[in-house]
Amino acid sequence: MIQIDALPAFSDNYIWLLQDTANRRCAVVDPGDDAPVLAWLGKHPGWVLEAILVTHHHHDHVGGVEALKHATGAQVFGPANERIPARDIALEDGAQVHVLGLAFDVLAMPGHTLGHIAYYTAQSPTPLLFSGDTLFAAGCGRLFEGTPEQMHHSLQRLAALPEQTQVYCAHEYTLSNLRFARAVEPHSEPVQQRFEAVTQLRADNRISLPSTIGIERQTNPFLRTAEISVKQKADEWKGHSNPTQASVFAALRSWKDVF
């Protein structure tokens, strides 16, 4: 059984800490800062950091990699098509990574960056997805390198995963994302209920993650481009009809960028 905890970093990043409590082994996902990880290891003597999983090259995801590798000897996994510091294993779509007794499938997720990857496993009691900055709770990453078509395809690929899949994204953006979701679907009861629940969580200084694929299908406008009401709002924003789901996505993303 793997336990997963969030190590907060910077203003809104989460470094995900995977723990094999029976064997005192652990792994981290996207350590943008080494300090929170080293602090945790310092409080847990006898634990071994054996793997570092990286989704993409942005500094707030890789800034702590080299120091952690130097301190612990952990093996570093990351996308083949991006420059990842201290990377040992370069990963492409369809690869499989074995970490803490779980086999993670590597999914290419171009959009936020061109080489972005996600890690997915169905081997745990509940399927797990580490989506980096591709799929957020109620949102998605900005398009720094890829096209709207690429990002839409990446998100649709994630939306097809089992609905019970737990989604561990890299930032606490949920509340602001839900404000946008309410603008897109103002009459959606699931969106409103989620907004109220997350508002309370954040007021209590609790994190809003993980989400699930099922919740995202209901409340994330970027996964709901096939819905007529979502298309209508996208058309209103652009001032013309968006003929494809990818163009609906592009309209939503451009709207969110200035929301």
Curated annotation (Swiss-Prot):
Summarize subunit and interaction data from the UniProt record for this chain. Monomer.
Read off the PANTHER family from this record.
Answer: HYDROXYACYLGLUTATHIONE HYDROLASE (PTHR43705), HYDROXYACYLGLUTATHIONE HYDROLASE GLOB (PTHR43705:SF1)
Q: Which gene codes for it?
A: gloB
The broad enzyme category this protein falls into is hydrolase
Q: What are the binding positions for Zn(2+) 2 in this chain?
A: D60, H61, D133, H171
Has UniProt tagged this entry with the keyword Ribosomal protein? no
Write down the species. Pseudomonas entomophila (strain L48)
User: What GO terms are given for molecular function?
Assistant: hydroxyacylglutathione hydrolase activity; metal ion binding
Q: Which UniProt keywords apply?
A: Hydrolase, Metal-binding, Zinc
What protein is this chain from? Hydroxyacylglutathione hydrolase
Q: Please give the biological process terms from Gene Ontology that the record holds.
A: methylglyoxal catabolic process to D-lactate via S-lactoyl-glutathione
Q: Which CDD domains match?
A: hydroxyacylglutathione_hydrolase_MBL-fold
Write out the residues that bind Zn(2+) 1. Answer: H56, H58, H112, D133
Function as written in the Swiss-Prot or TrEMBL entry:
Thiolesterase that catalyzes the hydrolysis of S-D-lactoyl-glutathione to form glutathione and D-lactic acid.
Which reactions appear under catalytic activity for this entry? an S-(2-hydroxyacyl)glutathione + H2O = a 2-hydroxy carboxylate + glutathione + H(+)
Its UniProt pathway annotation is: Secondary metabolite metabolism; methylglyoxal degradation; (R)-lactate from methylglyoxal: step 2/2
- What Enzyme Commission number does this protein have? 3.1.2.6
The record's remark on the cofactor is: Binds 2 Zn(2+) ions per subunit.
Q: Which family does it belong to?
A: Belongs to the metallo-beta-lactamase superfamily. Glyoxalase II family.
Q: Which cofactor does it need?
A: Zn(2+)
